[in-house]
């Protein structure tokens, strides 16, 4: 309650509020409908997203792989992803694919490894803890696509980085995600915590290279037009200039 009180007071006394997408704007509007809220989308530095090494060679991966990048946390949907990958391997019998999970532990690591062992997927799933930034960047470029099966996100950056390499994204139709990952435009959205839906989406992209290319290109164009650091800086500067001009005219 105390936190909500201060958030409300800050919003009420702000000249303007920057929201990363329509979902965030709706949240702020619910707190104070009279606030000036401008959408300034998150942007990535495209110049920094350049692969400098051979990821597969470094980690001795001899097959295609799909990628997860994020915290080892329950809310990131890793459990759902592992169960979906189990369906891919053991029910759908897609054998020439591996899953790479990259990130840092947020309390779920031991449970994650336990589930991988329980499902006998230790040889099929590669977990890279505390990966160097260069390794993450090279992984984007060599992956087939990214999977972000989160239970919730506000405005995730990881899909934008994947788009920069023309890699589509499978994610969930939850909270702010659909404003970044657009279903059947630059990725595929499924319901959160639904391993069957997720496995079907994974299989769909694995079996259709033309669709992967189409969605990946759309994501690439989205980042270059709207979600890069230059656009973000220009839009932020314009907002500051508008605030200064309005204050001078008062």
Residue ranges: model-predicted function:
Residues 130-131, 138-143:
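Short alpha-helical donor nucleotide-sugar binding micro-motif in glycosyltransferases
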Residues 60-76, 82-85, 100:
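Conserved donor-binding/catalytic core segment of Leloir-type glycosyltransferases
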Residues 44, 69, 98-113:
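Glycosyltransferase donor-sugar binding loop
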Residues 151:
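Aromatic "clamp/platform" in nucleotide-sugar-dependent glycosyltransferases that forms part
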